[in-house]
A protein has these predicted regions:
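Alpha-helical repeat scaffolds
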Residues: 77-84, 111-123, 148-163, 189-204
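N-terminal alpha-helical membrane-insertion module
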Residues: 1-66
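"A position-specific structural signal for the A-helix of alpha-solenoid helical repeats
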Residues: 59, 63, 99-100, 134-145, ...
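N-terminal topogenic membrane-targeting module
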Residues: 31, 47-112, 117-121
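Residue signature of alpha-solenoid helical repeat architecture, marking inter-repeat boundaries
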Residues: 55, 91-94, 129-132, 169-174
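Extracytoplasmic/periplasmic C-terminal soluble domains
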Residues: 166-225
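Non-cytosolic head/periplasmic domains of membrane-anchored proteins
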Residues: 130-172
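Structural motif corresponding to the intra-repeat A-B loop/turn of tetratricopeptide repeats
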Residues: 71, 108, 146, 184-189
Length: 225
């Protein structure tokens, strides 16, 4: 409602400014039309530039917090992310912050809280393929840890086309290797060669935050023996 009122007031002020200029400079109808077009284009460009700069500044602030996540300082990470979320006006940035909160919640094993956020974001991030991929990927992992295997499998199948766009990109490849291991153990009923695949992945991907995932996969495999 507040934004709607601002738009109305801004539109009225813009119209009055154009009329004022037209009266002061005694502009003809064609000159007024040209003034309207040029000023509208200028306002659009200025607004777009301000929005891009605003989003860029906060995107950098978010990226600077990633080391806290890698160091498993989850509470500190969540506090700082939440402070950004509560401060920003941009809905896009707020959604990005919400999405970036979920890995920390997952690191703290608060999977139900992470699922709630990820499901609430569905309609908001659907039009941004990368954000939607990350949302779906994290949601798959949450379902696996909550042992909601039917939901995890259904989401995986529904997301396969989107996942295939990103699975071979270096920064995401390890996550999809992990996801396929979960699928093979929990949904596809595979056992043969999985211990070796987990060991190979553990050797290849040495990120500290993946150790717990590999340990959990080993424990799932042991349960099947």
């Amino acid at each position: 409602m507040k934004r709607f009122l601002i738009i109305i007031i801004g539109g009225i002020a813009y119209g009055m400014a154009l009329l004022f200029c037209g009266n002061i400079f005694e502009l003809s109808d064609s000159q007024m039309k040209l003034l309207y077009i040029c000023s509208a284009i200028a306002i659009f460009i200025i607004t777009l530039t301000i929005n891009l700069v605003y989003n860029f500044i906060y995107a950098r602030k978010i990226n600077k917090l990633i080391p806290l996540l890698e160091e498993e300082k989850y509470d500190d990470y969540i506090d700082k992310m939440t402070a950004i979320r509560n401060k920003v006006k941009s809905k896009y940035i707020r959604d990005t912050v919400q999405l970036n909160l979920t890995p920390a919640l997952m690191g703290k094993k608060e999977y139900i809280a992470a699922v709630k956020i990820l499901e609430e974001l569905e309609s908001d991030v659907r039009k941004v393929p990368l954000s939607d991929m990350v949302r779906r990927l994290n949601l798959c992992f949450c379902h696996f840890y909550l042992k909601n295997y039917d939901k995890a499998e259904a989401l995986y199948i529904n997301s396969k086309e989107l996942f295939d766009r990103y699975k071979n990109i270096e920064i995401y490849h390890k996550n999809f290797v992990l996801l396929d291991l979960f699928m093979d153990i929990c949904c596809r009923g595979k056992k043969e060669g999985l211990a070796e695949r987990i060991k190979e992945a553990r050797t290849k991907f040495t990120d500290k935050n993946l150790v717990g995932d590999f340990d959990y996969l080993d424990s799932l495999l042991e349960e099947k023996d």
